[in-house]
Amino acid sequence: MSYKEGDVLVTNGEQSPGYKIVEIKGLVVGITVRSRGLGKNIIASLRSLLGGEIKEYVELAEQARLQALQRMVDNAKALGANAVVNVRFDSNELSEAMDEIIAYGTAVVVEKSS
């Protein structure tokens, strides 16, 4: 899967069709730490009694992933890259109410293939 985040190509593959890697800049990481918050925890706890999707946590997870991804892209730009390949996400629970979300990949310079 490939897409553009601003002017930076982002893909979970080793390369993106139609592009060739001309320079490897190195590892880039984007991190965010999010608190679930008391209000959302109460609502989510009530929803969990009924079963099904807990929308408050889904929304929080989506926002955290996007922020980690944007920080990774910003770090790639700072290195002079115009693409990030092999993008992955990871997460860790830091405490009962806080999670760390990490986006990481390899910053590269790509050119369109001829």
UniProtKB/Swiss-Prot annotation:
SUPFAM superfamilies: YbjQ-like (SSF117782). Gene3D superfamilies: Hypothetical protein apc22750. Chain B. Signal peptide: none annotated. Pfam families: YbjQ_1. InterPro entries: UPF0145_dom_sf, UPF0145_YbjQ-like. HAMAP family: UPF0145. Belongs to the UPF0145 family. This is UPF0145 protein SSO1976. It comes from Saccharolobus solfataricus (strain ATCC 35092 / DSM 1617 / JCM 11322 / P2).
